[in-house]
Amino acid sequence: MTGTSILQFPVLSEGVLLKRYKRFLADVELKDGQVVTVHCANTGPMKGVLHPGGRVRVRHAPSPKRKLAWTWEQAEIPSSDGTLCWAGINTALPNKLIRALIEAGGLKDQLGPIKTIRAEVPYGLNRRSRIDLLLTPDDSADDQRPIYVEVKNTTWSHGDVALFPDTVTERGQKHLEELTALLPDARGVLVPCLSRPDVIAFAPGDSADPRYGDLFRQAMAAGVEVLPCCFSFYEDQIQWEGVRTVCPRL
């Protein structure tokens, strides 16, 4: 399935990033010279993908329910081999992307045949958390345990190794603990969504969040599965590049 288009969409508009500010906002100059303020769904530091003066792709989606008619979707970044590549920076997209990948059978070898997929299902202590995806195995599957999938958008890298997180994330720490607590009655699966095509492996971002790194290794030792899923980004689609290897420590 490598190279298969997983998501398609209307052609994005290209421009140049002028600045990002107030976490949620960025100014972009489009090719026609128009300067627009776009919504930035990624509220983190965006290490490695925030390059004022660099090329970006934005989506025009005006709606009475939205304050801004534009959304920042992709950024052109230096790749691990010294060339340039496109990265997906919209953190609202990975859950949809991974769901589409599972529905297309892209993770059948790792997850087995799947009968149903549910999103944002309550779980965890007092059911106060919501799992990104809850999978019910098909009746033909050897392992009939429910599969809890937590998705993390990943754009930071060191060389050709993708890293998550790029800042301290107490929420991410909690998710690792909750996935571990599901075992052995269910399968806990962490899916780093590698939103850049130039990486060959994934590791926890210990330098940004040492506790997350420790919890990551504890979770793996306990049986939590890690499936780093890599994608390449185009102006009108996102393609599947395969599952990458896991490095418990960089």
Curated annotation (Swiss-Prot):
It comes from the Bacteria. Belongs to the SfsA family. It comes from Synechococcus sp. (strain CC9311). PANTHER family: SUGAR FERMENTATION STIMULATION PROTEIN A. Disulfide bonds: none annotated. This is Sugar fermentation stimulation protein homolog. InterPro entries: SfsA, SfsA_C, SfsA_N. GO terms for molecular function: DNA binding.
